[in-house]
Amino acid sequence: DMARIYSDGSFMILGRKDNVINSGGIKIQAEEMEKRLQSLIDVPFVITSVPDRRLGQAVTLLIEGRLHLTAIEGRIQAVLEPYYRPKYIRMVNHIPRTENGKINRAECRILAQNLHLGGKEE
């Protein structure tokens, strides 16, 4: 796990190290971005990445269901700095989960890559 330690001795858990997206040299913690977007998106969603020639990894937002994309993009622009904003937003039928109901990040990454390459959601 990764944490931010403050000068007063308190700390905040940011998420798992393996969920860090390196996009153009900027380290983006997927769970931290999800927390920032939680109040804006009222359906299940996940931040993941796809390979990108220029950036290394491109931040990708998978959203369960069908929402108005323009409205979502406007909300995201209002709360996230440009370098944190998802480069791609994809609507999916469902967010892959483990047997315990947690987000299956490995499957989400594969799904995002398949959709990015023009494949279909399975």
Predicted regions and their residues:
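Short, conserved catalytic or interaction motifs in soluble domains
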Residues: 97
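Compositionally biased, intrinsically disordered low-complexity regions enriched in proline and serine
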Residues: 84-85, 117
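Acidic/polar alpha-helix N-cap and adjacent early helical turns
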Residues: 111-122
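AMP-binding/adenylate-forming catalytic core of the ANL superfamily
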Residues: 2-84, 94, 107-110
